[in-house]
């Protein structure tokens, strides 16, 4: 790339700043960490790697970066693209080969969405590999819009009020997942990916499934944002500002024990002035 334009420079600085803020706010990366950056070949993971490589140079702490891609043996997967890109960058990398494609095609009926099973199989394989190489953090490329979409997916279709946290410890306690792009918008990431001309690898397994529930939610949020700019950011801020006493989850707040506080100062009305 040549010299960046003013707007391109602003975009790059904004993504780096927001990623840095998210990393700091959630203590995502600590001194001595070995960060396994999960690369899918999509715009989000390329942007995440690009931003993390910059932050590695300027951060006051030292941490390692290891890029990992999972070759799921999808037909037509361009095996050469990521190794060539990572070699040019001079980044340590691993390609994990696991034929989850055949498993998904065998278990999921034709016409049904494959995302859930594919994601579980991929996540399990990557968790195991992170453990094998001694990675202390596992970085995923989910962004702010992904987090908000997941919140609505769980609310609309699962009846639960949960999203996708910026930092998560796996159930077995062996892996810590971080999402450095948690504060970044998909719009900015797409613009940055276009600007950098990353060698995008399309997902042939699920990319054509246009009737996904996530796409329905995404379309809804896009329409909201079009009519009311800033709404997505406001929803994300709400996820950071939860008041359990104002919801209805008895496991989060002890509603059953609520009683009048007899020691509280009484309030009296001046009846004559009503």
Curated annotation (Swiss-Prot):
GO molecular function: 4 iron, 4 sulfur cluster binding; ATP binding; magnesium ion binding; sulfurtransferase activity; tRNA binding
Motif mapping: PP-loop motif: 40-45
Species in which this protein is naturally found: Pseudomonas putida (strain W619)
UniProt protein name: tRNA-cytidine(32) 2-sulfurtransferase
EC number(s) on file: 2.8.1.-
Pathway this chain belongs to: tRNA modification
Keyword check for Transport: no
PANTHER family: AMINOTRAN_5 DOMAIN-CONTAINING PROTEIN, SULFURTRANSFERASE-RELATED
Positions with a binding annotation for [4Fe-4S] cluster: 115, 118, 206
GO biological process: tRNA thio-modification
Function as written in the Swiss-Prot or TrEMBL entry: Catalyzes the ATP-dependent 2-thiolation of cytidine in position 32 of tRNA, to form 2-thiocytidine (s(2)C32). The sulfur atoms are provided by the cysteine/cysteine desulfurase (IscS) system.
SUPFAM superfamilies reported in the protein's UniProt record: Adenine nucleotide alpha hydrolases-like
Cofactor comment text: Binds 1 [4Fe-4S] cluster per subunit. The cluster is chelated by three Cys residues, the fourth Fe has a free coordination site that may bind a sulfur atom transferred from the persulfide of IscS.
